[in-house]
Amino acid sequence: DVHAVVVALKSRTIPAAEAIAQSLDALKWLQAQGAEQIYFKYCSTFDSTPEGNIGPVTEALMDALGTDFTIATPAFPDNGRTVFKGYLFAGNVLLNESGMQNHPLTPMNDANLVRVMQAQTKRRVSLIDYKTVAQGAETIRERIAALRAEGVGVAVVDATSNDDLLLLGPALKGMPLVTAGSGVAIGLPANFGLKPSLQASQLPAASGLQAVVSGSCSVATNAQVAHFKATGRPAMAISPAALMHGQSDAVVQQVLAWAAPLLKDGPVLVYSTAEPDVVKAVQAQLGVAEAGALVEHALAAVARGLADLRGEQLVVAGG
């Protein structure tokens, strides 16, 4: 007896057809469990390319649910991701100036979400702007009705604060499909008569040794890796070049042998995080998808090995 079910899919960067198939399988299962509203959650940086996968999956879910309209907003103000006049900001800069333009798999070169989404879908895309949101749920509902009458299928929604998300929430009551980052979720529980729970604060403290596994190449993660190293804590880099030559298993074993005696003294860091020029050089040799998969599989093996060493408190940053 639960109020919400999360199905975690690795569908962000796989071929669009596979992402659609996985998402539709998840939808069928959720419908069989009695789900009343489907929430297609994606990253607050709207990671995608003109091929997808946000647009194609959204379209497929809309078709399967028989709905002609949904919203799209990755806004997550608590994490500095806001949408204003349809443009996505990361902190105080446009997304395409934030470092996300250098993402190794989904470089984001345009912060205009209406344009980005329109490139990925055949349905018309429009905007519910900040002025409409500020007037509350009824005005938002009226704007939705007007857009539907115009033949719009997807509306990007402005949100610069949690207050905006809480105003948006009631307007989404009864909408078969919501697509968004995780931020929009804060405005939905009240639609189902749910109140904040103390359950999370009652969970037992985590146990086990501590480790960080980092594969993200974002500006923020590069800075975090540099900070961790500056504190003097043990850190070991995984070289994509070493993995390229069929040495993945040997590299993983080397990392675990290094980490084993250190874990008892505090957290260790294993990272493949690199500057954009390094990433591009590896991609040029291997191809974008192959380079990502190579590092991903190595880090997964490292994470499993760390868990076997009682590194049961893992912080995983991308990859």
Where are these regions (language model features)?
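Cap/lid and interdomain-hinge subdomains that line or gate substrate/regulatory clefts
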Residues: 3, 15-19, 24-165
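Residue-level preference for the first positions of well-ordered beta-strands
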Residues: 3-6, 37, 69-71, 152-156, ...
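Short beta-strand segments
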Residues: 6-10, 41, 71-75, 156-160, ...
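Glycine-rich phosphate/pyrophosphate-binding loop regions near the starts of catalytic domains
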Residues: 8-19, 228
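Short, well-ordered secondary-structure micro-motifs
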Residues: 82-84, 191, 248, 280-283
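Conserved, well-structured core segments that form the ligand-binding/active-site neighborhood
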Residues: 91-255
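C-terminal structural cap/anchor segments
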Residues: 257-317
